């Protein structure tokens, strides 16, 4: 469809013709040739525009000179409703990841009629193994999680999204958290309501997300809703 106008977060959006109760909203997904986009960004940087915001300044100017087409996304081909979230804050990003774990999930990664294509590293399938303690009690388990390839978990993991090539050792607890790739959580460590970036090491017995004041004192970012963020390649000790 031909795009004839663009409004950046208007207070009263223009309704769809013939459907006064609905408006078309940009999902923030744009496709350009690299040369065209670079030229437009340079033109904006060298020009006299009052700002450099994509929605406020760059896209409206392009629209005045070039034809722009829009794709009306509505979950076509699947029984699921369309899914869109603004993940511009830590808490919004966290909630969107937790949507993957719902029953039913807000966004179903396993819907064959609506495939989600992403990077697939060459690792073996994830392995969740329960190693018994000397007492005979299990030292781990799994409930309502997503594990990416190459991950090995022998600890307790609940309500979490785990990236590829991670390790959760026996006796460790990971709960309501997001682990990026190559994260290690040592034996007896605890990670609760946290986002751990790539390559983070949580040493045996260490804690993340259990005491927010302690997290802040260590320099970790804690969101408004209490989600602790640990930066890439950080080592978290006791």
For each of these PLM feature ranges, what is it?
Residues 1-35:
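Conserved core of the sugar-phosphate nucleotidyltransferase
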Residues 12, 35-238:
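Left-handed beta-helix
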